[in-house]
């Protein structure tokens, strides 16, 4: 089989407070995150958003220690994965490639090229596929393969998603049971799945399978859990003026409180590592929302991190992928079914959906604000807001 490598893909996160603004810039400069009608608008808008959001985001990171633990956790997952595969007689080297912060995907590929591998397994640490997560990283890699003749000599395979892998489901069930058992009446606690949201148009227009995979994953977990508890699936982390997948986490928590729910356990279903959206958004912001709504006992299931069953599921995914026909970028990022990796460019026109039009109008507003910030003149300065 020769020298085998595994490339773990993840979002990345700022290591310290000074990294927050450039991290946000990298995030919003990704055309898979924000859809714009012309590529030249991407970086100016990313600069504006990252500048406006940096202060609030830094305050959030201060609440969890001043930086994201995502890099350390991902590296620990990589170490545990290599050890598990070694126990099974499969020697691999594991690399970590982050999309928006160090170690960037490009850094990982540079190391891979130096190591002169024979085979590479590309494994995103996103259980469910979305064009804005795994898809974005795949597009970066696809372009590198297209333009680098050395990479073209490397055999590779992609693992697009693994939300239905039995050991992943078992690991989630194990953690959920542990939290449920902390309640006086475990079967009466409401189970609340909170997934990272995406704009509704990604699903309806671009054919993103994310919502379907999230819903199927939730059902598989509840079936394996085998408990009578009521449960809810909602979506968090909405950004911007357009409609995202619903129901929203905050609205759902308030509604459950109004219905008289007192015991609640939250499961971060789309995250496998602790980071800002579990440690700050769920543990602090949503806990406060829940308590104000009358929910008395708020618990959260920890992220999988290096849970033994989770690491074993990753190891099985790797070994299975090495025995199967390779999955290529063309198969994953350019499928025959109705899914388009959004977009590197959108055409202008009035015949698109209202949501896209609203997004474009919002983009124009952002650009107008950018001009006012640069010029120091405009209506916001006139009324004293700026």
From Swiss-Prot:
List the SUPFAM superfamilies. Answer: Chelatase, Chlorophyll a-b binding protein
The protein's Enzyme Commission number: 4.98.1.1
Gene Ontology terms for molecular function: ferrochelatase activity; metal ion binding
Q: What is its main location?
A: cytoplasm
Q: Which reaction does it catalyse?
A: heme b + 2 H(+) = protoporphyrin IX + Fe(2+)
Q: Which HAMAP family does its entry note?
A: Ferrochelatase
Q: What is this protein called?
A: Ferrochelatase
What is the scientific name of the source organism? Picosynechococcus sp. (strain ATCC 27264 / PCC 7002 / PR-6)
**Gene name as annotated:** hemH
